[in-house]
């Protein structure tokens, strides 16, 4: 029996890295039937045990418990959740300053998911070479807000060697994930960080500035500098899953202390009297964009 990490999932076959070789493996039907609430019983990053067949292929026997993972609502009319990647040291939401435009709501949903599932998170703002007047001030303000609540923010451009070297130092010997919409440059960054992986780079539609999907399946890519990066399919929206409305504020670090002062245990932090979170917001201790993101998320959970 062999033990390894899942590097790629195409739906029916899984590439498993044992450290000595990569084995194309299948998953028995019982695993697919056991977890009906999950669209993918195995995800990239999973640690598995497998038996090797005479033809060199593998059969996955056991899926080890995950240390952490990133999940989102299933798409295309499917119910339940879709797990993007597991067993991470860190995960980064990638956005571009322009083409497509930065989406702070997406960032906040990603950060809430990371808080809920125990993943260290950070933010990468790409395509800074496209920044126009006012963009740099916007980014500086954003960096200040997110750093103050514990999230590192990195700015980069594939044209800026210094910023790429900084990312290399962050990814070195770590298992990391890149999550973001299509077109923000996730794959382009990976190509510069590790030129051995000449991954297909997608063009951004000039008519809509919304990226075309280029990475079809999630994959965990070994880096020349050591470690792995999970390159995931572009995601237009990041839907929360398995988070109750009453617990949402627990995943906003800046709300944890103020909520202790709330008069009511069931406080939603929107309209109740004696709310510590509302008081903190009105006193300027909580960023308005973050607070409004919280309200939008709460409303989506109540729908």
Predicted features along the sequence, with ranges:
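Helix-rich effector regions associated with P-loop NTPase G domains
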Residues: 12, 37-54, 65-84, 120-121, ...
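Conserved beta-strand/loop subsegment of P-loop NTPase cores
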Residues: 88-95, 118-128, 150-156
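Short flexible coil/turn linkers enriched for glycine and charged/polar residues
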Residues: 8-10, 54, 86-89, 117, ...
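Canonical P-loop GTPase G-domain recognition
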Residues: 130-184
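Histidine-anchored nucleotide/phosphate-binding helix
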Residues: 105-120
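N-terminal accessory targeting/assembly segments
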Residues: 1-104
